[in-house]
Amino acid sequence: MTAENPPTTESSVMPVAAIAGIIATVAVFAISQGLSYPLLSFILQRQGLSPAMIGVSAAMTPLGFIVSSFFIPALSRQFGAARLALACAALAALLLAAIATRQDIWTWFPLRFLLGFAANPLYVISETWMIAMAPPAKRGRLMGIYASIVSAGFAIGPLTLALVGTEGWPPFLVGISAFVLCGAILLAVLPRMPEMQDEKQPTSVAGFVLVAPLLLFAVFTAAAFEQGLLALFSVYGAAHGSSEQRISALLTVFIAGNVALQIPLGALAERVGATRVMLLCALFAAVGCALLPVLLPTLLIWPVAFVWGAVAFGIYTMGLIQLGENFSGSMLMTGNAAFALAWGTGGIAGPPLTGTVMDLIGVQGLPLALALLCGALAVGVFVSLVSQRRPAR
């Protein structure tokens, strides 16, 4: 799926402490990020803001993710990945404190944008370190563990609001403390982190799009699928007579499958290859879309939703594995930044595109749009596999 030789690995010894530290860092960071989205929405809702304004405010953070993606490779080369990651953790804590101090939507627009801008480099750098340190023989399972724990962190974030509430400083202090803890863990593990090589041959994020377009389309597909489904499944379910409680429970099962099955998918990738597993994930996701209208009223929808969530996000996990198989050094960093760009773009584009199809043909536009997206990816991956097997002339 890409056009660069795989990096060579000098040792198969796994730096367990360093990998555990990076996973813990990103998990804590994800909890704080997952807490901030619903917390700020609750506050704006109490202030009487319209759903449209609340949505625009929430979009500032992913917009910050997208914009920062173009700067991460250069900033990493200029200041070093370690310094950049530490600065981002500290800046995120300060920005969340500023958001807590000035609870005004107009002030929050730039602050939430900057929060996304600061958060994205930490994810990109952490994923780059994670991929670089993972021995090839264990990369599938390790990236599965990483993906599962990050997803769990985002899921745990909103649950903390049930414990500390959504008013006053307590929820903000939880988020700020998480960002500070993230920086402390980073400080502890930084001496064990690998250095990025190939720094004399920088590649831009835009240039990486030409190097690995199918990989980036896979990331776009995973993000558009997830965000489109989460945003519009309530509309689809209500049109089919499902209660709000049942719809919420099905979405919870969808997310649970995402969290639970990334490790088995990673293990399968080690046996048969990440590209083949990505093809299976895309096909199963498309089949799930086709079965949705039939299975939604039945009990079979529950196990299907569980597997559906796993394979939908599994597309992204397989993309990370392939990124590590084909790139190293500064190209790996640039590739991860391009992944962040593709994820942010897919996450923003997915709901309106899917919603437009629903407006045109009715509620069945949701599974149709998502199935077409996954089907297009499956065709691209299949063509890539066939071309790889074709003998060179």
Identify the residue ranges that each predicted region occupies.
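Helix-loop boundary and gating motifs at the non-cytosolic
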Residues: 13-62, 227-236, 247
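Helix-to-loop junctions at the C-terminal end of transmembrane segments
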Residues: 68-80, 165, 261-273, 358-359
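Structural signature of the two symmetry-related core transmembrane helices
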Residues: 83-97, 276-290, 371
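Cytoplasmic helix-loop-helix junction between adjacent transmembrane helices
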Residues: 113-149
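Intracellular juxtamembrane helix-capping segments at the cytosolic ends
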Residues: 121-134, 313-327
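Symmetry-related core transmembrane helices of the 12-TM Major Facilitator Superfamily/SLC fold
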Residues: 172-188, 367-382
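C-terminal transmembrane helical hairpin of 12-TM major facilitator-type secondary transporters
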Residues: 275-317
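A late C-terminal transmembrane helix in Major Facilitator Superfamily
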Residues: 330-359
